[in-house]
């Protein structure tokens, strides 16, 4: 796609860019026929080995779907990051995990009391476990401008293809969807914010 849009292609590149922009804008309205959604929002699966054993499924989605998801995410990225505040450092914060680890170490070293606890949670397979209706509800509340696209992508099961067969993707976001991490962060932000409020 980058080659098609190269300046060296002159007028052809401009025509491709205009057509691509129109197509992405159409997708952002959620205007995708129901018959096409399972395939368009589906993906090919590849499996990566985890360090501790097991495999991590990665969905390699349609290039145009990924492009649209990136465009949708960029439209609301600043809003999302400011909405999360300091509660969530996984999405939109380069080296956020490092910052969290350093902050936790500083906190533990500065505490002089026996009634203080540092509670660390690792949500096992959480990315793929959050119910889609919750993601859609949070997107409607926090980022209504991209809700039509998110609804089109996640309001019904999509197809994941592997080795000539397909399985139905019905829960969570696809690993490999550019909107997956922020949708996960959007969904878990309210309980994390509430927990912070109660613990202060």
Sequence positions of predicted segments:
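Short, intrinsically disordered, charge-balanced linker/junction segments flanking boundaries
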Residues: 193-200
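Conserved pre-catalytic core of RNA-dependent polymerases
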Residues: 1-190
């Amino acid at each position: 796609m980058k080659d098609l849009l190269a300046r060296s292609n002159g007028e052809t590149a401009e025509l491709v860019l205009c057509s691509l922009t129109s197509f992405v804008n159409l997708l952002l309205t959620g205007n995708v026929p129901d018959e096409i959604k399972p395939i368009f929002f589906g993906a090919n699966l590849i499996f990566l080995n985890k360090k501790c054993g097991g495999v991590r499924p990665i969905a390699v989605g349609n290039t145009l779907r990924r492009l649209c998801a990136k465009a949708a995410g960029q439209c609301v990225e600043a809003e999302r990051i400011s909405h999360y505040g300091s509660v969530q450092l996984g999405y939109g914060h380069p080296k956020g995990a490092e910052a969290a680890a350093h902050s936790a170490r500083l906190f533990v070293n500065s505490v002089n009391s026996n009634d203080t606890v540092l509670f660390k949670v690792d949500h096992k397979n959480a990315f793929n476990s959050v119910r889609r209706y919750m993601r859609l509800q949070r997107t409607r509340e926090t980022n209504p401008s991209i809700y039509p696209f998110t609804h089109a992508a996640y309001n019904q099961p999509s197809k994941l293809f592997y080795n000539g067969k397909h399985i139905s993707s019905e829960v969570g976001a696809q690993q490999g969807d550019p909107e997956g991490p922020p949708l996960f962060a959007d969904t878990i932000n309210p309980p994390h914010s509430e927990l912070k409020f109660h613990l202060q």
